[in-house]
Amino acid sequence: MISREELGAKSAELGVDPSHVQQDYVAGWILAGLYGESPLGRQLVLKGGNALRKGYFGGTRFSEDLDFAITDRVNPAAFLDALNDVGRLAQARTGVQFHLEHTAQIGRERIKGAQTVYTFGMSFTDFYGRTETLPVSLHMDVTELTRLHLSPQSRSLIHPYSDHADCTADLTVMHLDEVLADKLKCLLQRQSIRDLFDLSHSILFNDEIPIDRKSVVSTFLRKTIFSPSPAAALNLLAAIPFEGMQGQWDDSIVCSRETRQDLTDTVTRWKDELRQLFADFRLGEQGQLAFFPAHLRTPIMDAGAQRKLLRLTYKGRTRLVEPYALRFKRREDGIGQEYLFIWDRTGGRSRPGIKSLLNYRIDDLAITDEPFEPRYEIELAKAGELTERPTFSQGPRHRTHTRIATRRPRPRPRRR
């Protein structure tokens, strides 16, 4: 284990709390054990923030979790056994005191179809030996049945501590272009300042590894519903309101003083960079009508996150609705469009219930102050995923070639 003096010096050098340095140090040893000693390492693909920090850019932000993809099913019991084996190994080599009796599966979430994310937790004693504080925890998310669009890469573990010669392993890491494609997708779905940081650090400020911008965007388009209309994705990305997120930037980004950038400058440069990222793709208006534009999408996403009702005017009627999902669906004639699935409290021509709405028939939309208790899972954070479920409960359909709406449909003649 690194000494308390090294821990304090590293914390002071980087300008981060010692707890983040402890987590980062232990994460390195867990990765070294998984990929260097455990058979489980042959199945795991490191992704997310620590794929960047431990596999590509040692100077990027700290990430408190380890995220893995696996193309097969997860065996929770086998994974727990492997974690405890790795914990015992790391404890013997470093002196870090793990609480292996508390290693556990602490979460399970079905995200789409049969795909599930399992969350596991390990804990260890604070390096300063403070028994009055809770043990420091390290979480690991494992997503099973993951489809990888690019071949993973082998990268040497980045472990910026004095025992780096002993803490070594060749990590299997998600391809850098796919990591950044995932960050673009998540940027649209959750509008997280951390995703902006990861993208800007990797694409704007990185001078270590060349970035294949075309590969990043083409992978992003294949992983989302926006392949038919790159322009729709570009416009949505450009409209994310980062300017109001200074507090999140200051509080949630844990990185060295040297790495931290000014948010205003980062946003300005990022919006300029977006045009360059999409420069090789067709950016006409063709197909944009099929997707909810930013001025509707942003309040819909906010209402779902806050569990607040929306008031909107649809086909000339004012409605009070509960928002649940944005899904890209294909009609029987092959036309594909994005639909907003809501519970309509007002009714209209029919009784209150589940309805699907098209963006170009909405005239006004605003978040109310009235909360609601969800009747279904709110799936708005999954907007943009490639899934075609016709109802809330039914499983995903197989993908097929889909045409998209390119103009407003002609109104049907009224019968007299």
Indicate where each model-derived feature is located.
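Structured mid-to-C-terminal alpha-helical surface segments
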Residues: 1-44, 54-66, 70-294, 407-416
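Core beta-strand-centered patch of the WYL/Sm-like small regulatory domain
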Residues: 135-151, 156-167, 289-416
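Glycine-rich beta-strand-to-loop/alpha-helix junction loops that act as flexible
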Residues: 46-50
